[in-house]
Amino acid sequence: MYDYLVVGAGAVGMATAYHIKRLSPSSRVLVVDQHPGVGMGDTAKSAAAFRTIFTSWINRTLAKTSVGFYREVQNSGYDLGMRHVGYLFLVPRENEATMRAVAHELIKAGTPVELYDKMDIPIRTRVSEDEEAREMGLPDVSVALLVKEAGIIDPERLVRYYYEKYVEAGGEVMFGVKVESVKFSPKRPIGIPGEPFPWQDARVAGVETSAGPLEAKNVIFATGAWTEMLMDAAGFGLPIKPRKRQVFVVKASGELGDLLRAGLADREYAPMIILPRGIYVRPEPVEESFWIGVSDRRRYGFEENPEPEEELWRFGIYPVLTKYVPLFEGKTPHNAWAGHYDENVVDYQPIVDRLAEGLYVAAGTSGSGIMKADAVGRIAASLALGLEKAELHGGMVVDSAVLKKTRCFEEERLVI
Amino acid sequence: MYDYLVVGAGAVGMATAYHIKRLSPSSRVLVVDQHPGVGMGDTAKSAAAFRTIFTSWINRTLAKTSVGFYREVQNSGYDLGMRHVGYLFLVPRENEATMRAVAHELIKAGTPVELYDKMDIPIRTRVSEDEEAREMGLPDVSVALLVKEAGIIDPERLVRYYYEKYVEAGGEVMFGVKVESVKFSPKRPIGIPGEPFPWQDARVAGVETSAGPLEAKNVIFATGAWTEMLMDAAGFGLPIKPRKRQVFVVKASGELGDLLRAGLADREYAPMIILPRGIYVRPEPVEESFWIGVSDRRRYGFEENPEPEEELWRFGIYPVLTKYVPLFEGKTPHNAWAGHYDENVVDYQPIVDRLAEGLYVAAGTSGSGIMKADAVGRIAASLALGLEKAELHGGMVVDSAVLKKTRCFEEERLVI
């Protein structure tokens, strides 16, 4: 009988398990994952960038404290592959006024950002002189915002860090075991098969897995894109849906190599570049390449073995990418992969909630799970431990229920 | 080319279409439904009760104005089968304090409710003297609340009323046609197959159906339990999920007949009775019977042809029902049916929102669609017509975006 069973050994699950063990060393904690090791689900398929600068309080709080923790780990000598290359938002005219307002707010608050007027934008785009681009309806870039407290990280090292610390502290793991459902038992059994019935008070008893049942007093689902199907089947409705995501890798050779090494604001490498129409270009210095993706309005749904689609590159990304950054002309990806976002379809923020006695969920990170994993893990651990408050890295304290599904957050204005 | 195409001829869809036509008589409006007539989906499977008394503002506003409209229709001579039999909440001790607080608030506000102390509760229950009930963990009833502005209605007549008025006003309908998907077209076509691509500005062009494409400038999905699968496929995430619901019908013969005719507060028939553990007993005077259901924590999911499950009656309802109302002992349902709720899994309120240019949704009524259909229809019509405000029955004005998916409502405290 485990005290806490965490389903999912991705960034959120491992951070949660680590923080449970840290806060309650004598508890018996188990992490179960269907993969043969940690971080092999969608954590490994992340675009793995981070920033701490957002307009909404909740984004800022989760990302800033998490990234602060990662930085401390990195500075302590455990290399997480963090590089503070920055984010460069290339902003079309239609959004210029909004972006200027956001930038001025940030600058006033002392945030390290830089606003470039059209003529000073450090990445040359040719949309304004290109007739085809105009026919395609692609907007000219009229201003750019460089966000400096931002960069890239290696999610596999991050999750491995949590895993090592967790195991050191006596945490247990079970890999290659798939959790199939959550089990409840009646608080007052009456001895009739089929219990618990709808009218019986019940609490979590454990989970059914591909390797048989596991008993636990508390189960925390940190199951990302798998969350919807597991919780639907258990009768707990969450506004979290899986959505396919794809990343295409282009070698940074020739002039693209120069672009890769053209860091801004004294950084060694190019920033994460956010183009209009949801396309992003992420530097990958170790592999001398760029990772490219797009936030497309794709159907929701889960694919058992998601594969990257050449068509998305060809029709969804390439035509726009090459208009804004002509250096990519003629390039084709030499690698690509696909995974899932676990998207909160209401406010795109994670949900950490208690769904029933002994049943918790920590999911819905909506594409920013890596940069928020530490805070989400601390909140999930505190909630599962029955603490009213969660202490985030750096000492900031939030309500453990801050991410419950019925919360209300302001809308983020600085989005990809 | 239609100006407005409403998908779904249930209560919400027909109310929406009727109000569009009422507010914009010259618009060409079409209602499409897969069934051979109006109200043949989940509208016909509703428990079809109404109340106007809630603790939350939004529940009160939607139900009170809608029921006010139905009452006016009924009083004008168009029989909607409304009977103001009331709702009787039988409250277990664990909820007594909350219910007393709610009741005192309501009484202070001049709401027609009546609170019965244990000895005066007009329905005799025997839980307190029953050892088996105690072993089952069933709580004794310690107080009861009678809500008078409440009762039952015939949803098929209601939807027929809207249908007749809509057709009279020149509205068009297409039955037996299943809408399969929503179609978009690029605002600036470039003439390449596969348009619109993710980076193109697009707007609704119409729908694909089992009978071929239909063109429309605006499409409103009033698709209840079908909403999730249709909108998931279109890439629009909503916190709305289908959940099976079942109603069991028991003949009101012998002493049950006396119970049926034992109206409270001068009403002719028994009230809708809400037992502990989510079981409700609805009088059906026309058929001399009771409709019985339970809000069970059932898995989410859609069934193509949902059937009632004898097991739910036998293990989920009967053991509890007979403990609270022993008159049901030995009774078996002579009829039953199953349908779906379209449940908003966050706040159990309807969502009326604009998802893209020309694309609207009006769904998620979560089991109170009949009693809120008029207000939801007025809000959906106003939003689709581009009006900032919606005028509800009785002259109350709300923002047309009041039910957008990112709203924040207080939690309802008076629930089944």
Roles of regions detected by a PLM:
Chain A
Residues 1-12, 30:
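Beta1/beta-strand and adjacent pyrophosphate-binding region of the FAD-binding site
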Residues 5-7, 32, 207, 214-226, ...:
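Short hydrophobic core segments
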Residues 21-42:
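Glycine-rich FAD pyrophosphate-binding loop
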Residues 117-127, 311-388, 393-414:
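Flavin (FAD/FMN) cofactor-binding core of flavoprotein oxidoreductases
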